[in-house]
Amino acid sequence: AHGALEASLRSVTSGHSGVALFVDPNLITTAYVTQALESISTGVVSGVFTDIHENPCEADVLAAAAFLAPLNADCVVAIGGGSTIDTAKMALLLAFGGGVPKDWWPVHRHDPVDAPRLYVYPATAGTGSEVQSHALISDDKTHRKMAIGHERLAPTEAILDVSLLASCPRRVMVLAGIDALSHALESAVTRTATDVSTAAAMDAFALIWPALVELASQDRILTAPACEQLHAGEHSGRRQDAGRCIGLQSAPVIIERIG
């Protein structure tokens, strides 16, 4: 629902003694996010990481892991787009699983990682990272993309609050929508696709196309198509992850608060 961030943050952080926050630097100064963060109980937040870069590389996530490791956090919260969420995911995996990114790629490892719960609040509509057990980062030298997968990268909950999209530039929203379309296409044509995943990918196409067309034709973000694109981005993200990871036992709990 609109304005779900503040109440949701209070709920997911209650009962925790150390909350690590990963927040998009463009969001941390907005009144909406600032007010929500201030609502968290005093003394609960262990640290706030805002050194988020678009399309994070190995050095970026190693820095994030170095931030997280000494905090003794029992809860991790990410507020932002796909880059923020992927940075938080990799920080969690490296801080609690050890090693460097290439230790976890390209083989999809299944060794247990005892890590805190991860709650994510996507601020763009299309990356699908909020519902995937993968994080996409770049090689420092070659810039090659690495899709690192592990069951602990699947968020515990993804909370969809359309109010977070208000600060997102329309161009970014449109590009995120195109990203979501590409996820649906990948899901439909992958060799591991099933009848169910293909049908769901087509549903994602049907959801996102009219919303994307409307967003692209306007000079501002409209609530209705933004909601549809947020929903479709999450939907196609799940299908893309299913195509990559048939047989994974864990899946995130999704709270679809759209309306």
Regions found by a protein language model. Give the residues of each.
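Buried hydrophobic positions in well-ordered alpha/beta secondary-structure cores of metabolic enzymes
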Residues: 21, 57, 82, 122, ...
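Electropositive phosphate-/nucleotide-binding environments in soluble metabolic enzymes
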Residues: 2-3, 30, 34, 58, ...
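ATP/NTP phosphate-donor binding region
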Residues: 1-75
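A glycine/threonine-rich phosphate-anchoring loop and its flanking beta-alpha core
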Residues: 96-195, 199
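Glycine/serine-rich anion-binding loops at beta->alpha junctions
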Residues: 73-89, 123-129, 244
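Short Gly/Thr/Asp-enriched flexible loops that form oxyanion-binding sites at enzyme active sites
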Residues: 36, 65, 84-97, 131-132
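Active-site segments that bind and position negatively charged phosphate/pyrophosphate groups
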Residues: 187-259
